[in-house]
């Protein structure tokens, strides 16, 4: 019976062990998480200053479609934020500020410039008052005479002001007077009532540091793309309905680099963008009404700006080592005003913008496009907000867009806008900084393709909607790169399996994997976990090969640019991208090594799975979906794996220590003699302690028998208890009192009797506990025996029924076989008889013919 119980316990333990799931580490699974690592850029502009900012572009980039769902946000996006920051640095690099012009914070005596003759002013005022509306409000093109002569209606001369100021610097304690011509918008003047003189200062003189370029540089836009470092990837939402915010984009592609983009610095409009399509679509902020509207390229919208060139540039030596570039005009002559004109089907494009806005799911205003209008920002804003601000070959233009807004609303016919130039501008990225740009000689002209509109959508009571132009330059890059997101490849995954470490794994069919470089690793991201895990070995090799390939490509381009990387911001980013990839791979291998899984694609462990209710669906769930469910368990799993590995290393160390005793020569090793001496001392101490224990036990045993040790107290100090024993007392009492046949009076020391009493009580307690435990075990055994007998009888009965059923089925099959055999035999015999008769009949035909012939002849 005990053997049967032991077998049942072993079977239950085996079932428990078999049902326990253990943590299995997979290396090479297609999973990722959001990342903020710096990107590096690549460009094909090899002949401009931008080539020292980015690496050469080889155009060898591919995209792989993923069967996954991912969240995208153009405004909460590290790719767009890096683009905004980097373009700002490119902008700063292009003008290279180096000289602080703080000496110009001096009082200047200024007077406004006048025309050379009074005829210009008269003709100007006359033309303003006497021209017909047809002449004033005409739409111009390339062939319009006023466009070629820069004298279209409404365009005048740039407002300038002549100033004089004194500076000390070239000669000690000697002042020198300088004459300078400023744009009137770059100075602020105040009138002294006591002297009736006008004193002017440079604008923003006391609030910012103004810098001038050491050399004259143009802000030439460059086209470039961002690339992810090895070990990282870029995901793109390929859904045409994507509007800047999509929590569940189901059309996702993976790539190593973005599309080409162009550096843009302008307000109101975006120029030369790469996202223009044959449709109009809107990117809308997820929490407010900020939008960026991509215009339909079908309408061929463009902007042509021009500044007539009738000024020269001269150098003014302010003090030793400080040179100031001043724009010099002939006396009493002001420069012509800059202006821009709009080409293309602008009215049709703006009407399509209104219709697209009315259909947008985020829009809650009126659907009547007649009540949707374009509006300028409110008055009192910064010049970059109130005017359209753009850069034309180094000069910053501030264009008054009132005529343009009236033109697209069919209120006027002027498709051009007057502009003025400022030398001191507000920066578009960092608030409160001003950059001084030197003037330029000659005529300036620039042509740009208009691809987007920066605007805020405002509506009230479903009656009127305003599309207000905005000065958020950063929105341009959210349109360019807002459908991308940067992710870090996390090839280490955890999943529960029944295999334990050192157990044999089930055989798996080997599947081939097409090596597609680094992105080939992500090709199985949309596959089920089971299918992806079958190719995990090949995927890990593809991952490593892709990282090495990207490292080599990056190293090659860095080598080609090593001379130009000394003074650029991008150089450090490129080198950081290379170092980051190596660190990431080493970090993954370090984690695997801490778990005892170094350089293993599938690693079984002895750590039990922490949550039995959480199990993967190997046939229908992707690794990315599974990773999202177990991400909160990764810290605990990692800690448990590290502890298990530490314990494993300790066990291996102890095992190696035991293995050292297998060699007989190690017993006589000199390094072991100290241990031998230590063991001898411990043995001696143990023997002495054992002797002490034995002596104490013997002493207690003598005390129990009534003896006193030699060093005990004198008898007079021990109180004696007189115990009278009755001779008629039962024999069992005599036996209990150690015989009792001696009779008479006996004297017991009362401490010894008390000890005997305690010992008897302890014996009774232990006896009772023993009896209770024995009864409990016996009853449990009887209960288990009864259950076992009933289970055995039930199994025996079911086995008998099954055996009887099998015998009955066997007999039925045998009977069916006999019947079939007899039926087939009878059928064969009957068929044989029929065939035999037919054969005999055929054989008898000649005989019958002969007999008939004989009868006929007779």
Curated annotation (Swiss-Prot):
Segments for region (V3): 305-339
Region feature V5, mapped onto this chain: 462-469
Motif (Di-leucine internalization motif): 857-858
GO MF annotation: an example: structural molecule activity
Spans within the Cytoplasmic topological domain: 701-858
Pfam families xref list: GP120 (PF00516), GP41 (PF00517)
Span list, region Fusion peptide: 512-532
GO biological process: clathrin-dependent endocytosis of virus by host cell; fusion of virus membrane with host endosome membrane; symbiont-mediated suppression of host innate immune response; symbiont-mediated-mediated suppression of host tetherin activity; virion attachment to host cell
Transmembrane segments annotated in the record for this chain: 680-700
Motif (YXXV motif) on chain: 707-710
Keywords: AIDS, Apoptosis, Clathrin-mediated endocytosis of virus by host, Cleavage on pair of basic residues, Coiled coil, Disulfide bond, Fusion of virus membrane with host endosomal membrane, Fusion of virus membrane with host membrane, Glycoprotein, Host cell membrane, Host endosome, Host membrane, Host-virus interaction, Inhibition of host innate immune response by virus, Inhibition of host tetherin by virus, Lipoprotein, Membrane, Palmitate, Signal, Transmembrane, Transmembrane helix, Viral attachment to host cell, Viral envelope protein, Viral immunoevasion, Viral penetration into host cytoplasm, Virion, Virus endocytosis by host, Virus entry into host cell
Lipidation (S-palmitoyl cysteine): 773
Signal peptide: 1-19
Protein name (record): Envelope glycoprotein gp160
Organism: Human immunodeficiency virus type 2 subtype A (isolate ROD)
Taxon lineage: Viruses, Riboviria, Pararnavirae, Artverviricota, Revtraviricetes
């Amino acid at each position: 019976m005990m053997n049967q119980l032991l077998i049942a316990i072993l079977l239950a333990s085996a079932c428990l062990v078999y049902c326990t799931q253990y943590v299995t580490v997979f290396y090479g699974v297609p999973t990722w998480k959001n990342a903020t690592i710096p990107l590096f850029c690549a460009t094909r502009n090899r002949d401009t200053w931008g080539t020292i900012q980015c690496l050469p572009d080889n155009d060898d980039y591919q995209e792989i479609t993923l069967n996954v769902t991912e969240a995208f946000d153009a405004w909460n996006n590290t790719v767009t934020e890096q683009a905004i920051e980097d373009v700002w640095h490119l902008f700063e690099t292009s003008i290279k500020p180096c000289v602080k012009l703080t000496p110009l914070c001096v009082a200047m005596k200024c007077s406004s410039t006048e025309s050379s003759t009074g005829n210009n002013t008269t003709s100007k005022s006359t033309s303003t008052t006497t021209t017909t509306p047809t002449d004033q409000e005409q739409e111009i093109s390339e062939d319009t005479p006023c466009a070629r002569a820069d004298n279209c209606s409404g365009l005048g001369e740039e407002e300038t002001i002549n100033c004089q100021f004194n500076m000390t610097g070239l000669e000690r304690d000697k002042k020198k007077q300088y004459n300078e011509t400023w744009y009137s918008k770059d100075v602020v003047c105040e009138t002294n009532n006591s002297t009736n003189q006008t004193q002017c200062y440079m604008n923003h003189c006391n609030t910012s540091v103004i810098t001038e370029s050491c050399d004259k540089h143009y802000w030439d836009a460059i086209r470039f793309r961002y690339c992810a470092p090895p070990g990282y990837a870029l995901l793109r939402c390929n859904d045409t309905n994507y509007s800047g915010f999509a929590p569940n984009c189901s059309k996702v592609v993976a790539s190593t680099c973005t599309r080409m983009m162009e550096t843009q610095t302008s307000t109101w409009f975006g120029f030369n963008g790469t996202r223009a399509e044959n449709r109009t679509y809107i990117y809308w902020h997820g929490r407010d009404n900020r939008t960026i509207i991509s215009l339909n390229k079908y309408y061929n919208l463009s902007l042509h700006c021009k500044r007539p060139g009738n000024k020269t540039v001269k150098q003014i030596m302010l003090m030793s080592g400080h040179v100031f570039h001043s724009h010099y005009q002939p006396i009493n002559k002001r420069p012509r005003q800059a202006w821009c004109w709009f080409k293309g089907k602008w009215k049709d494009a703006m009407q399509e913008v209104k219709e697209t806005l009315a259909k947008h799911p985020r829009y809650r205003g009126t659907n009547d496009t007649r009540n949707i209008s374009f509006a300028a920002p409110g008055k009192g804003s910064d010049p970059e907000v109130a005017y359209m601000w753009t850069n034309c070959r180094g000069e910053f233009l501030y264009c008054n867009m009132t005529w343009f807004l009236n033109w697209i609303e069919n209120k006027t016919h002027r498709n051009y806008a007057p502009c003025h130039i400022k030398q001191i501008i507000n920066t578009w990225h960092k608030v409160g900084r001003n950059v001084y740009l030197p003037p330029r000689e000659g005529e300036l002209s620039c042509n740009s393709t208009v691809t987007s509109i920066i605007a805020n959508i405002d509506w009230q009571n479903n009656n009127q909607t305003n599309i207000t132009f905005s000065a958020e330059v950063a929105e341009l890059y959210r349109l360019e790169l807002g459908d991308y997101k940067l992710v870090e490849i996390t090839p280490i995954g955890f999943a529960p399996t029944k295999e334990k470490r050192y157990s044999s794994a089930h055989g798996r069919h080997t599947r081939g994997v097409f090596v597609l470089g680094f992105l080939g690793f992500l090709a199985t991201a949309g596959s089920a976990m089971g299918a992806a895990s079958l190719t995990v070995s090949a995927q890990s090799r593809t991952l490593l090969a892709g990282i090495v390939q990207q490292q080599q490509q990056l190293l090659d381009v860095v080598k080609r640019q090593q001379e130009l990387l000394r003074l650029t911001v991008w150089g450090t980013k490129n080198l950081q991208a290379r170092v980051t990839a190596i660190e990431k791979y080493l970090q993954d291998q370090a984690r695997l090594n801490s778990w005892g899984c170094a350089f293993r694609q599938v690693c079984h462990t002895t750590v039990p799975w922490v949550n039995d209710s959480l199990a993967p669906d190997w046939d229908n769930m992707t690794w990315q979906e599974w990773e999202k469910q177990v991400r909160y368990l990764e810290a605990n799993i990692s800690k448990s794996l590290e502890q298990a590995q530490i314990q494993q290393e300790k066990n291996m160390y102890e095992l190696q220590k035991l293995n050292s005793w297998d060699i007989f020569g190690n017993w006589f090793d000199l390094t072991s003699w100290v241990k031998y001496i230590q063991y001898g001392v411990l043995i001696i101490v143990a023997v002495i302690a054992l002797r002490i224990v034995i002596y104490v036990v013997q002493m207690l045993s003598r005390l129990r028998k009534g003896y006193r040790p030699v060093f005990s107290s004198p008898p007079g100090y021990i109180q004696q208890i007189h115990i009278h024993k009755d001779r008629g007392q039962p024999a069992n009492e005599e036996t209990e009192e150690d015989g009792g046949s001696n009779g008479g009076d006996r004297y017991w020391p009362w401490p010894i009797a008390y000890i005997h009493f305690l010992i008897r009580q302890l014996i009774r307690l232990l006896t009772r506990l023993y009896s209770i435990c024995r009864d409990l075990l016996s009853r449990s055994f009887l209960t288990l025996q009864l259950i076992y007998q009933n289970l055995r009888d039930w199994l025996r009965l079911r086995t008998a029924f099954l055996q009887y059923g099998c015998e009955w089925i066997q007999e039925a099959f045998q009977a069916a076989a006999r019947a079939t055999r007899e039926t087939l035999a009878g059928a064969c015999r009957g068929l044989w008889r029929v065939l035999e008769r037919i054969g005999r009949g055929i054989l008898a035909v000649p005989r019958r013919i002969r007999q008939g012939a004989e009868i006929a002849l007779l």
